[in-house]
């Protein structure tokens, strides 16, 4: 290794670095993106299942919203320990374990009959999935330099809007299996969308590599370059391995507050989106599914474009705050106006902005955390944020039951959008190197 470092000139090092990053990107990002896309489908397929399930099981909007949100309470409670266990046992073992257990529980949702069973299964699903997303973000930080991180995260994270596209396309046909083999359409949806998680857990187990130094699919020079490049990166606060110091950093909790606002808007809308769109347009479930699919494709383009520009300029805050502001206006328009296609357009814009701000937002912690402190810091931020995943859908359900419509809930989402923009602009972090 020492001889290699001495002989390698800057031009050769740049070529080795490009090759290493290209191989890592093509090896890891598709694997993790597909895993996260499957997870996201299992997390929010309940939004389509509810179109039949709530009627069959006599669930009110408040019961549905509370149960849907309990997933995030469990996720938040278990996230920090799960992410620390990932750091201890390695990403390959821990992420594969997460996928296996959540896949089995996602399939088990088909057996729900009462509100208590619904609450219990959603809670257990949150326990099972806890740590997957922050674990992946930590894992990517172990492989890619900070200057590329928003772009890398967006390529992984683009699985989220694309999974919405796939879910929108398949939900209608699955729900139309109503009565096949004596099962309701919503039961088929849970069964057939949970099975891929179980199967893909084996793929992660076989193909992931914990750290660059262990990657036998890289050359010796490429492994050496990645290890040295990542070890040489500057960090604002120098937390390193000091978890306690990282958790005392107010920026950790400020980013957590931004995530809280973000996830409140995300799941208040997305877990009710099919019902809102069906009510606004009068369309059937298949047509509503295609509306969701179209929004997913637009969101994927926005995510990649915003993340790429953020990396090229090295700027993070405005790439998060501006989408928050546009989203605020879009929710207000969707809630205050009644013209069906104006509502659809407003909600599509809100979704696109919501998805578009994610990668720059998630890239921020890498500017002041690293190592075990990053694992704990990201998990702590996401834990705070995940409470928005509980509050958003529950509040939307309560408002729907009391007013008979979703319009008031949509207008209320202006508040977390505005607060999220303000917290973002008040954040003080080192500007990332442009690339």
Residue ranges and their predicted role:
Residues 87-99, 311-324:
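Cytoplasmic membrane-interface "Motif A"-like loop-to-helix N-cap segments
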Residues 121-158:
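Cytoplasmic helix-loop-helix junction between adjacent transmembrane helices
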């Amino acid at each position: 290794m020492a001889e290699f470092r001495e002989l390698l000139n800057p031009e050769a090092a740049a070529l080795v670095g490009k090759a290493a990053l290209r191989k890592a990107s093509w090896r890891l990002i598709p694997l993790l993106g597909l895993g996260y896309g499957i997870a996201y489908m299992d997390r929010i397929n309940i939004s389509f299942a509810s179109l039949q399930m709530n009627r069959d099981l006599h669930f009110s909007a408040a019961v549905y919203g509370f149960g849907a949100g309990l997933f995030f309470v469990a996720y938040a409670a278990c996230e920090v320990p799960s992410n620390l266990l990932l750091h201890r046992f390695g990403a390959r073992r821990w992420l594969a374990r997460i996928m296996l257990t959540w896949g089995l529980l996602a399939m088990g949702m088909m057996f729900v009959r009462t509100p208590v069973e619904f609450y219990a299964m959603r809670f257990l699903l949150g326990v099972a999935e806890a740590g997957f997303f922050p674990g992946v973000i930590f894992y990517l930080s172990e492989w890619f330099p900070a200057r590329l991180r928003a772009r890398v995260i967006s390529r992984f994270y683009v699985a989220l809007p694309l999974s919405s596209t796939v879910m929108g396309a398949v939900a209608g046909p699955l729900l139309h299996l109503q009565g096949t083999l004596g099962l309701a359409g919503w039961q088929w949806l849970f069964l057939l969308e949970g099975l891929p998680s179980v199967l893909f857990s084996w793929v992660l187990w076989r193909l992931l590599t914990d750290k660059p130094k262990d990657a036998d699919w890289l050359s010796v020079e490429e492994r050496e370059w990645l290890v040295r490049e990542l070890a040489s990166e500057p960090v604002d606060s120098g937390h390193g391995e000091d978890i306690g110091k990282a958790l005392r950093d107010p920026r950790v909790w400020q980013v957590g507050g931004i995530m809280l606002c973000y996830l409140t808007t995300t799941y208040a809308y997305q877990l009710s989106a099919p019902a809102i769109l069906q009510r606004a347009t009068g369309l059937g479930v298949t047509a509503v599914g295609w509306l969701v699919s179209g929004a997913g494709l637009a969101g994927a383009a926005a995510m990649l474009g915003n993340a790429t520009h953020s990396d090229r300029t090295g700027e993070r805050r405005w790439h998060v705050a501006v989408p928050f502001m546009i989203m605020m206006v879009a929710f207000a328009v969707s809630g205050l106006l009644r013209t069906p296609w104006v509502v659809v357009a407003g909600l599509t814009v809100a979704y696109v902005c919501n998805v578009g701000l994610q990668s720059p937002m998630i890239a921020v912690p890498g500017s002041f955390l690293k190592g075990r402190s990053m694992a704990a810091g990201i998990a702590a931020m996401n834990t705070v944020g995940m409470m928005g995943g509980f509050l958003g859908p529950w509040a939307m359900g309560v408002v729907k039951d009391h007013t008979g419509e979703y319009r008031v809930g949509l207008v209320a989402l202006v508040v977390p959008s505005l607060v999220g923009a303000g917290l973002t602009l008040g954040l003080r972090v080192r500007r990332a190197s442009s690339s």
